[in-house]
Amino acid sequence: MISIMDRSEIVARENPVITQRVTNLLQTNAPLLFMPIDIHEVRYGAYTLFMYGSLENGYKAEVRIENIPVFFDVQIEFNDTNQLFLKSLLTAENIAYERLETLTQRPVMGYREKEKEFAPYIRIFFKSLYEQRKAITYLNNMGYNTAADDTTCYYRMVSRELKLPLTSWIQLQHYSYEPRGLVHRFSVTPEDLVSYQDDGPTDHSIVMAYDIETYSPVKGTVPDPNQANDVVFMICMRIFWIHSTEPLASTCITMAPCKKSSEWTTILCSSEKNLLLSFAEQFSRWAPDICTGFNDSRYDWPFIVEKSMQHGILEEIFNKMSLFWHQKLDTILKCYYVKEKRVKISAEKSIISSFLHTPGCLPIDVRNMCMQLYPKAEKTSLKAFLENCGLDSKVDLPYHLMWKYYETRDSEKMADVAYYCIIDAQRCQDLLVRHNVIPDRREVGILSYTSLYDCIYYAGGHKVCNMLIAYAIHDEYGRIACSTIARGKREHGKYPGAFVIDPVKGLEQDKPTTGLDFASLYPSLIMAYNFSPEKFVASRDEAKSLMAKGESLHYVSFHFNNRLVEGWFVRHNNVPDKMGLYPKVLIDLLNKRTALKQELKKLGEKKECIHESHPGFKELQFRHAMVDAKQKALKIFMNTFYGEAGNNLSPFFLLPLAGGVTSSGQYNLKLVYNFVINKGYGIKYGDTDSLYITCPDSLYTEVTDAYLNSQKTIKHYEQLCHEKVLLSMKAMSTLCAEVNEYLRQDNGTSYLRMAYEEVLFPVCFTGKKKYYGIAHVNTPNFNTKELFIRGIDIIKQGQTKLTKTIGTRIMEESMKLRRPEDHRPPLIEIVKTVLKDAVVNMKQWNFEDFIQTDAWRPDKDNKAVQIFMSRMHARREQLKKHGAAASQFAEPEPGERFSYVIVEKQVQFDIQGHRTDSSRKGDKMEYVSEAKAKNLPIDILFYINNYVLGLCARFINENEEFQPPDNVSNKDEYAQRRAKSYLQKFVQSIHPKDKSVIKQGIVHRQCYKYVHQEIKKKIGIFADLYKEFFNNTTNPIESFIQSARFMIQYSDGEQKVNHSMKKMVEQRATLASKPAGKPAGNPAGNPAGNALMRAIFTQLITEEKKIVQALYNKGDAIHDLLTYIINNINYKIATFQTKQMLTFEFSSTHVELLLKLNKTWLILAGIHVAKKHLQALLDSYNNEPPSRTFIQQAIEEECGSIKPSCYDFIS
């Protein structure tokens, strides 16, 4: 360890000039620049805020901020009586406070006229956050309105009040300084901190990327930290400047000898315990500001912590890693080991992270960051994300080889493992830098006055709320008192829906269609109509009074939860002083972003003119990345703004505002719709914030006539289309200007504007939010390989390559330019042609074409995934019982996506000829690795019917034959269902396997129908023979004997019938057992005839048991006999059903035994003799199935010449 450089030494080596300057500043106590990375609060006793980060040269620094006032505000008239009353309330609750101050602020909810604009507040100061929180809770429960009432993260309030961002350069002034080892410690007061307004110098914070390698002696399993024999045998670490991918130093800590390398320092440890301690020691020497790994919050950190616990060294490890605070084990586990932190990936998805958060080092899981950047990514592996970015891939080293190298302790091979491990760490930093993750998050923190930790681990709405409060509390925005606590009744319901014009479905090949969109509709509406909580008027009388005084009001009304919600917002009429908080903030963000985008454009132009080898290229590239990060952060806040305004958990939530924005969106889209229609334009589709418009036919008259008068070649037609696109662009530019002027006249502002992005021609609308076409942006471009696609299922997450390919083929074929004089195939013809080729020529598809992905969410009712995971769990348990590896059936982490295919199962039928093999998706799913390993056949028909046909039906459901009657409400759903049914019949007509399966079902049904008729006939005769016994109550025994004799005589007379029936059953059973056709190389199921007969046999036993039950109920005199018979029949049926008679054949001993019972009770005269043989048979059966010889002898002895067979039983 001594030979490895620590952080200070590395900084001095890399930045000697800056280090000398920083040293001089420290010696003279001159102002210093400090970049905060991590924040920690001391909440007990006097409140203290600690910020950790680096100085300008890269030195590790701790800034301790003391004398921070702890307070909150309460709205109350500040006269002596009220102050005394407030004091008495606090005193009565034993709440210790320091002092009270009076101030005036504007309440955030409700409009107040000029003379009543500000309300009195009392600011209460405390010695600790504990007393502050007690007082806030008490006064809120008493009904008082509070403000500046942060109770969880008080540092956010400090940042807002001081206007001191926690993620950018801060200048330290008048500090006290104490060097301690690698850490430079500063103590300041809030007044000694100054926000550095310029971009500042290059940040020299240090990132440590790491990776661990683990081993398990149980092959094929994922190493589990809870298993004593599973170990971490290697940890590789590499450090970088935060903005660079060039490593500053690298270390490999290993338990197996490893050949030395010039790329890293190797530390050999004798045990896992020593390896973990060495990791902590090296961590402390480098003192990183950020620690990152790939999926380390799901695997690496839990493994390290659990193993440290097992070795009893977690406290020692934490205190080595933490340069600042030493803690006891219980405090570490409670406060610093974050076991379950829910990280939001997208609106629908979150992921659980676990990590050890040592003060001064911020943990970042690169996988989580990449998943947030690519929320719809089907693969979330390190290799997949590297491929998406075009970065160098990771090293390919299978786990079984890695474990083999570890077991053999081959130093040469272990060097390969070390290289694999250290490159994984390198790629984490590559991804962070490529995606500009840290600068992007920092800019969000600067705008929202939150920490870097907040920007990584909290959702966007939380940061918008904090930003609003930061704007509101300052004088230039009106000194508005804001609470962080949501109040009022939390209602759930739907706001007014968007204005939608149903699409004109079908393929448009004659006229271009242009999209006209509102630019940032909801933020624009907020700015235009002054939607802000402090501009809201709830009372109609107050609204009338304000209008009488000359105020302009915007009225909103909508229905919510079966009641009318209405209100008014005071308009600003373009007067800055009248603008509300929301419009002011949005306008400020918009102006900042506009300026940044202009600067970004200039920097981009410079980058194109300078070669990468130029000395100033890196600086220019860095500046471009920083400006881009700032404008992205502004965009995020503007887009998230309405979401927070409509969030009923937000302290800013106001129902009339949330619904008023959406209802105003409706109004304005209708306004534009009517304007465009009245101008003679056509509407193809409209939804929420956009209209798809076609120009009047007269616009194209001249170019169309020119084409008609030409030779009408394909070249002439292409020229016609080219000119139509140009004319549409010009017309839309004019129309767009007219629409914006019309909107300006209507709402009195220029904030609400529309713009057109592209002309689509040809274009096809298949449903709401579903369309595709060729997009022409600046110039005409008829490339069918670059389609503009919205909402079509081929871009849906988890979709197979098969569906994407078929859908793409249909769209590309339909987009080809075809002259009116040529045959223009209707879309249904194109779909059928592509579909037929896909179904008939199945050899064109590869295994990879059928791979799907889905997410495992245990709390979501995804039946297919739930069934599949249940099957995989059963497989794992079964394999574990036999001591076999089960990792190939491992369950993904909740929220994680997994890959699978649908495989073909054996076709089976029940007694009536109905399919009994499961058609449920969950029963057919298999992991990709398992399907590949066992070469399982793909169920192509399942993919066609369940995925492809739905997509294809979407293209053709506008056809007249699929349209619903007038009384159907959901016409699109009806047409889609009919179109899919049509295509299913089309596939059945061309798919050979489907035909063969249908034929098998027909054969089974015919066989069953014939046999069932015979069974019914013979059971009816049987019942008639015993009719006299059923009706005779005086002498039941004699009647039973007589009926039994009739039955024997009848049975002897039926031999010819039985023989005929036997042949028929044999014939049909043989037909049913013939193998069916096997299309596309996939074996079809072919159930044997004995399976059919087995089912019929069970049904017969059930029917005869009913008759025996009737006999039992009728004759007490033969109670013992029939009880014996019934019990044994029940026993045999139960045995048959539970054991399923795997060795069962028509002539098997089991059938003979059941037959013996049947014949014996019919021959009542010999029943008392047969009892002993039946008992002997049953005793024998309990041990092993009786031999055929034994049964045959017993039957011949007791029943004479009756020769049993399985077919006799049918009679």
Swiss-Prot record:
Annotated function: DNA-directed DNA polymerase involved in viral DNA replication.
Pfam families per record: DNA_pol_B, DNA_pol_B_exo1
Gene Ontology MF annotations: DNA binding; DNA-directed DNA polymerase activity; nucleotide binding
Protein name per its UniProtKB record: DNA polymerase beta
PANTHER family recorded: DNA POLYMERASE CATALYTIC SUBUNIT, DNA POLYMERASE DELTA CATALYTIC SUBUNIT
Signal peptide annotation: none
Catalysed reaction equations from the record: DNA(n) + a 2'-deoxyribonucleoside 5'-triphosphate = DNA(n+1) + diphosphate
Extra information: Consistent with its intracellular location, ASFV encodes its own replicative DNA polymerase and three base excision repair enzymes: a class II AP endonuclease, the repair polymerase Pol X, and an ATP-dependent DNA ligase.
Entry keywords, A to Z: DNA replication, DNA-binding, DNA-directed DNA polymerase, Early protein, Nucleotidyltransferase, Repeat, Transferase, Viral DNA replication
GO biological process, alphabetically ordered: DNA-templated DNA replication; viral DNA genome replication
SMART domains according to UniProt: POLBc
Each Sequence repeat, start to end: 1074-1077, 1078-1081, 1082-1085, 1086-1089
Region (4 X 4 AA tandem repeats of [NK]-[P]-A-G): 1074-1089
Its EC number(s): 2.7.7.7
Organism encoding this protein: African swine fever virus (strain Badajoz 1971 Vero-adapted) (Ba71V)
Similarity section: Belongs to the DNA polymerase type-B family.
Induction: Expressed in the early phase of the viral replicative cycle.
Domain of life: Viruses
